[in-house]
């Protein structure tokens, strides 16, 4: 019988497919929530960080904070989270220190935070933007990843939360042929977590998406509003635009619905960018936004804004 081979501590350095286990939990447009008007608990500020050129955090699973092996013996480690230097996030690391100016590889960021549950709730982690790949770990577990440096990412982290928490972000700014910027381009590649990091608390059943716009019929006198919930239930939402004297109910069936109503808002233009405060409430959840109403059409070679040529 062949003896079981012991895993060598440094064997992970030869792995070529080490990222496959982290190719799940993608943050996409379907995992986003409407964030306008919601209270955000910012995690901005000082984060411990380390350059991780060889993705050792992913290979050796630093995020698990395993300091002893299965037999209880202390193992050599390449990290000590709380002894790392501190970087103020959000930022692009290329602008923080001259020695990182041209660095486009991986960095690991970590910090601790406390959490007190206020009610039966769902908690999302928002990373406003991280260029280019961002993998999230919370309390020793892999949460998910996001590709794309210019869009926000949201993950439902409710099941991972404890009273005291350790969060780790593994950010990879490496250029690749399928990314923007690509490998060879006249475009500086700003890397890092360069927009807000925050927790967003919402009711278990919450407003997931909301849209409002002019009906594109050329009259500029009809408005359509659409909303969806996180659960496929029957409910009613209330839409309010105080300045226009508008208060309408949106009937939601299977968690989605819309309403069309008459209104004559002042139209948005570059010269006079009028905005209206819009609020939507469903149950205990409320979202809000500032909205400009305008219509864009194409007529032959002309681009029309509110019925008038732009050029």
Protein language model features and the residues they cover:
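Secreted/periplasmic carbohydrate-active enzymes, especially glycoside hydrolases
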Residues: 1-311
